[in-house]
From Swiss-Prot:
Name under which the protein is recorded: tRNA1(Val) (adenine(37)-N6)-methyltransferase
The entry's keywords: Cytoplasm, Methyltransferase, S-adenosyl-L-methionine, Transferase, tRNA processing
Gene for this chain: yfiC
Native source organism of the sequence: Escherichia coli O157:H7 (strain EC4115 / EHEC)
InterPro entries membership: DNA_methylase_N6_adenine_CS (IPR002052), SAM-dependent_MTases_sf (IPR029063), Small_mtfrase_dom (IPR007848), tRNA_Adenine-N(6)_MTase (IPR050210), tRNA_adenine-N6_MeTrfase (IPR022882)
GO biological process per UniProt: methylation; tRNA processing
Lineage, opening ranks: Bacteria, Pseudomonadati, Pseudomonadota, Gammaproteobacteria, Enterobacterales
Subcellular localization(s) per the UniProt record: Cytoplasm
């Protein structure tokens, strides 16, 4: 490995089929995003949208999981993060399939005629709190730039009738998000509560909504077993991505 490559790989996350540099992004690649990217239903999708793309992690994961005919649009408001996402995509096997847009999602969706079978987002979820060190991190953590009602509205404007809109959120915020989504006409179709181990309460929730009514399937995912190694279920979900699984 060359010295420059070694330096690059300390600034990001190496997966089996791609590398995500994230040193210029406010929010880094982590378990939440990896869970969402591996969990979101991709069967039969033709076009995907990643709202708040950050480093491009979710778009890259979806590209790995879908056929070569699937097109993925990734929209990111912060210019430095969008540039890094573009660089990550350019170094991946899926340059021709992923389009990164530096844009405000509220403005971007009004210009689109295409509809998406799958929309995915790892959204900001804090309404207020301690001031962050940078405006970029504040934007990534707090809902001031993209509140949940606006996010749901934007997704509704560009999703297909049978499409899925998927998010990952802290458990309690996910419950509030679900109530809001239902009040806006969305239908909850998939829910996975995520706990660190069997002894702990769920701390994250994966949610999939659709404009179309249907049965809701719910389950629970435990990340680590009694031996503190990754559980069989978590391994099965993510082993296509983690380098050493």
């Amino acid at each position: 490995m060359s010295q420059s490559t070694s330096v690059l790989r300390r600034n990001g996350f190496t997966f089996k089929q791609f590398f995500v540099a994230h040193d210029r992004c406010a929010m880094k690649a982590g378990t939440d995003g990896i869970l969402l990217g591996a969990w979101a239903p991709v069967a039969g999708v033709k076009r995907c949208l990643d709202i708040g793309a950050g480093s491009g992690l979710l778009a890259l994961m979806l590209a790995q999981r879908t056929s070569d005919s699937v097109i993925i649009d990734a929209v990111e408001l912060e210019s430095e993060a969008a540039t890094q996402a573009q660089e990550n995509v350019a170094q991946s096997p899926w340059l021709e399939r992923i389009n990164v847009h530096t844009a405000d999602i509220q403005q971007w969706v009004t210009q689109q005629t295409a509809r998406f079978d799958l929309i995915i987002s790892n959204p900001p979820y804090y309404e207020q709190g301690v001031e962050c060190a940078t405006p970029q991190r504040e934007q990534a953590r707090y809902t001031t730039s993209l509140d949940h009602q606006t996010l749901l509205t934007c997704a509704a404007e560009c999703i297909t009738e049978e499409g899925f809109f998927c998010v990952v959120l802290p458990e309690q915020i996910g419950n509030s998000f679900t109530e809001l989504a239902l009040s806006m006409g969305w239908h909850l179709r998939l829910r996975t509560d995520v706990a660190e181990n069997e002894a702990r309460l769920p701390h994250r929730v994966l949610l999939a909504f659709s404009p179309q009514a249907g049965e809701c399937f719910s389950d629970r995912l435990v990340i680590r077993g009694p031996d503190q190694n990754y559980s069989e279920a978590y391994t099965a979900l993510t082993q296509a991505f983690y380098l050493f699984m």
